[in-house]
Amino acid sequence: GCGKSTLFSWMIGALAEQFSCTGELWLNEQRIDILPTAQRQIGILFQDALLFDQFSVGQNLLLALPATLKGNARRNAVNDALERSGLEGAFHQDPATLSGGQRARVALLRALLAQPKALLLDEPFSRLDVALRDNFRQWVFSEVRELAIPVVQVTHDLQDVPADSSVLDMAQWSENYNKLR
């Protein structure tokens, strides 16, 4: 590949020891590449919706909430998020019974409930059928616009990129970089 996974690993602070990066990563006027992973406050959504199948949908979402949120406010935040995403009443549902689109929504909700300062999207729409993909894509970008957080997205399909976005073609960049070396 051209380094997409390596870039994301570096951004979240999980770069394998056999790799190295130079440069700095800044977010909201703070250098974050020197911070531990947990302090970077970067959410990530993978192409496979990674949920903990031993927990209910609601328990998966409760895991993401900041520790500062206490008592009934935790449950209310999760129920509000489920309702916003069209999954009201799914709190006690087993994640294994969810459709692919529902799992993707729960995974995104979990990333957003953690209150990230930025969001990384790693091919989040690629495994969804065309109709579901369009709806989910619109919903995802509506949610992140409301939160006003930056998004870095990896995709092979330019239809997944909002029209007002900046695009870096890493294949071209990688090709040019290797010519300069």
Positions of predicted regions on the chain:
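Conserved ABC ATPase "signature" region
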Residues: N72-A90, F141-S142
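Hydrophobic anchor residue at the start of the ABC signature
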Residues: L108
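Conserved ABC ATPase signature
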Residues: D94-L98, Q102
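A short, proline-enriched helix->beta-strand linker immediately N-terminal to the Walker B motif
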Residues: L113-K117
